[in-house]
Amino acid sequence: MIAHQNKIVGEGLTYDDVLLVPAYSEILPREVSIQTKFTRNISINIPIISAAMDTVTESRMAIAMAQEGGIGVLHKNMTIDEQAQKVRKVKRAESGMIIDPVTLPLTAKVIDANQYMKEYSIGGIPIVDDKGTLKGIVTNRDLRFEHDNDRPIVEVMTSENLVTAAVGTSLKDAETILQQHKIEKLLIVDDNYKLAGLITFRDITKVTQKPIANKDKYGRLRVAAAIGVTGDAVDRAAALVKAGVDAVIIDTAHGHTKGVVSVLKDVKSNFPKLEVIVGNIATAEAAKYLADAGADAVKVGIGPGSICTTRVVAGVGFPQFSAVLEVAAALKGSGVPVIADGGIRYTGDIPKAIAAGADCVMLGSLLAGTQESPGETIIYEGRKFKSYRGMGSVEAMKQGSKDRYFQDVEDDIKKLVPEGIVGRVPYKGELYESIHQFVGGLRAGMGYCGAKDIETLKATGKFVKITASGIGESHPHNVTITKEAPNYSR
């Protein structure tokens, strides 16, 4: 008999194969803290990230994710300029003070103002001279009844009795000034009357409406973006950094390669302050390799996604629960966060992933059906769905994700070897409704386990391995479901 012990490296488990064991608890679900690490130096207020997929995350999803306390990762199936523009859109969507507001020169025309307002979803634009000195402001009210697109902006802007405030004005004082003058935008100027920023009443209001929004030190929403491993990786990173991105993900199907680390080192050497996440991996060796190379976080998941066919096409993969367990153990004490990417089907899988050692989870299919996703809306047999596809599908690869699967040199579409499919998911309404259920399930799981915060759940969570009968017992059984729950379907 041929020895084979060294060929079988272990048993692989999925989230369905285990359950968290309840423990003594002195804490209620509403009392737990779910703040966690996204990278070495970036924290997020909920441990949920939206995937860098072209039917999941563009600027609208990234804005909504940050407002709910998480973060969105903009996909890279677009030009460098388009991706950088989406980063800017997120950074300008909400801010304590907009430090780099959209402006127009004195030579601008009405058509320019209309285009900017539509492009950036804003209602007012400061007008400055070539030295940056404030000369006026044009708002949507100034343009509402203006039909001459070629009219100079200086003829319609407000230039007299401008309400301004000095650099350093607090949000509380700014709110008072806005209310006193019954205006919506406060122009911030320096001692030389140069425009230094803009505070809007809408942004002040959002601070109270979304108290756990994930923001940078300037009060802007945080956003991440994906880059690839081809020749434009550094150029793409440069454009994203200039646009204000908080972190980038070197996004490939197999992160444990020499080429990926080469890109990581190039990006790090050019932008030493930029947080760089690397994925995807599934083993302890890969985790240590990337951490030693300077990765600020690693992303775990080879083939667990609902639209991924890597495991059946290539015969390669690692059941997700075991992969997270192994990678987290290898990186314990290193300060490198673990992102569990894929395989999350129910809210209960989130506390399982975290107890296995993940710092946060990345979601694709569970978010693809929300209103904020860029996927196409479909009506099928009287029900509303949204399109959802893997980045390894032929359709996505044609749009630019070939390099993720190391097929960027293949120009003939018929010769691509896809590792994903195209499908649809039920429409789920606005993102905040889904996030509420995800967070609620996580809090409930932490309460059952007596974990006051994410680190405690990671350190003390224990599991029991269950059988197929145990899986069946876990789901509703011996009954016909007559009304759908907001957080459960089979």
Residue ranges and their predicted role:
Residues S43-I48, G96-P101, E160, D216-A226, ...:
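Short beta-strand/loop segments at the ligand-binding rim of alpha/beta enzyme cores
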